[in-house]
């Protein structure tokens, strides 16, 4: 059986990670391909492709540049996709086409309108990764969702995704939870090449050694987690993800200001996106006030799951999620999560999880961070690990999708 996954780009993203985890299945008789709609061009791209090819997955690159501007280039890519997809259909004759996120969803819908007969013998599968779809595009939503519902294609990744889809589009899709795996750990703070550039290299005029701010491009924080040093006095907090409104970047900046100069904590902010400037400005303002800078901004970390035990806590003030892969990976790799109790994120943590804020309330975060220095981190780690281990297995996810590919009708 030949399965084609359509993703936005070969780059860092939760949906791309899910597609890769499915496609890397070694089930006999399954041949996996991954097709990008827009050409990934990040530092992560060649590593992502190499990982897939090592697992025997064939990767199909796009020539359409990956540019984000009010979903304009994504729509252009979708409109140009049919001719490229026609070649794929004639050359490879896939048995299953599996789409992930709005850009591939739209691209396949456009192909179905241009070449309606080409999909008659192809099973369509579509994973819904988010609780919010087609923001600002109601007419597009109506057309695309009608297409996928007519093919009985929809699969949700969590209860919250299923419920939000049912409320808006009137269908209750089955659920297949995302799967994650435990990863061999390395020391992030003891690697030969720094993972990123500190803010000190962007706003050098604000930073000086007399104020205790960072002035070096090499990490100055001692290692934590599996290689914890006894003299380490502060807690190392990781924020990792796209610097976009969905991820709660505004709240992150408020917390950075709230804890500015607090020697109990050090924040590593790993990410990039449209709100990167906001983070840079926040850290520059803190430094300009003469407070010791207890944070650094670095690019996204490739293979992040393999560095998680280098940190004490993961901070996730997301406004909404589908089903957070990052939170699941953190729990399974023994990194406790401080999170906003939003749909898709709260689903990944125990019901009685004590590190949850509600409505991204700053007072909740103040209370949580004040409790951290005396919290029983080992107990928190084990609680989250046991929860994730029981619910989120990569192999279980692969087997359920492969059963769905083979089935004539719904089996979830």
Locate predicted features.
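N-terminal strand-loop element at the rim of the active site
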Residues: 5-73, 166, 273-274
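Short His-centered aromatic/hydrophobic patch
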Residues: 99-105, 128
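Aromatic "clamp/platform" in nucleotide-sugar-dependent glycosyltransferases that forms part
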Residues: 300, 319
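Short hydrophobic beta-strand element within catalytic cores of glycosyltransferases
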Residues: 336-339
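Conserved acidic donor-binding segment of nucleotide-sugar-dependent glycosyltransferases
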Residues: 351-363, 370-376
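A charged, aromatic-enriched C-terminal amphipathic alpha-helix characteristic of glycosyltransferases
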Residues: 378-406
């Amino acid at each position: 059986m030949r399965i084609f996954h359509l993703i936005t780009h070969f780059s860092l993203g939760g949906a791309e990670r899910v597609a890769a985890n499915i496609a890397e299945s070694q089930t006999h008789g399954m041949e996996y391909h991954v097709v990008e709609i827009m050409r990934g061009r990040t530092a992560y791209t060649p590593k992502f492709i190499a990982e897939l090819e090592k697992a025997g997955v064939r990767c199909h690159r796009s020539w359409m540049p990956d540019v984000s501007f009010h979903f304009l280039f994504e729509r252009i890519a979708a409109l140009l996709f049919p001719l490229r997809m026609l070649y794929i259909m004639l050359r490879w004759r896939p048995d299953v086409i599996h789409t992930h996120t709005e850009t591939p969803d739209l691209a396949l819908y456009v192909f179905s309108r241009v070449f309606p007969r080409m999909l008659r013998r192809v099973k369509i599968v579509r994973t819904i990764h988010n609780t919010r779809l087609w923001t600002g595009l109601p007419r597009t939503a109506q057309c695309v969702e009608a297409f996928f519902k007519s093919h009985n294609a929809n699969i949700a990744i969590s209860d919250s995704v299923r419920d939000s889809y049912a409320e808006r589009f009137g269908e209750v899709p089955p659920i297949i939870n995302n799967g994650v795996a435990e990863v061999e750990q390395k020391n992030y703070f003891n690697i030969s090449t720094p993972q990123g550039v500190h803010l000190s290299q962007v706003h050098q005029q604000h930073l000086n050694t007399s104020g205790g701010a960072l002035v070096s491009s090499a990490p100055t924080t001692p290692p934590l987690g599996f290689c914890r040093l006894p003299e380490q006095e502060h807690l190392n907090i990781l924020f990792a993800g796209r610097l976009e409104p969905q991820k709660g970047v505004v709240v992150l900046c408020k917390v950075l200001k709230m804890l500015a100069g607090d020697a109990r904590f050090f924040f590593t902010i790993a990410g990039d996106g449209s709100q990167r400037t906001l983070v840079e400005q926040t850290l520059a303002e803190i430094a300009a006030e003469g407070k010791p800078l207890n944070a650094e901004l670095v690019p996204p970390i490739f293979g992040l799951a393999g560095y998680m035990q280098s940190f004490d806590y993961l901070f996730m003030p997301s406004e909404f999620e589908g089903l957070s892969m990052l939170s699941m990976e953190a729990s399974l790799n023994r990194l406790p999560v401080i999170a906003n109790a939003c749909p898709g994120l709260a689903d990944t943590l125990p019901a009685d999880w004590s590190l949850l804020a509600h409505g991204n309330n700053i007072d909740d975060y103040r209370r949580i961070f004040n409790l951290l220095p005396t919290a029983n981190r080992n107990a928190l780690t084990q609680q989250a690990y046991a929860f994730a281990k029981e619910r989120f297995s990569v192999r279980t996810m692969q087997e359920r999708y492969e059963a769905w590919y083979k089935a004539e009708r719904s089996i979830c």
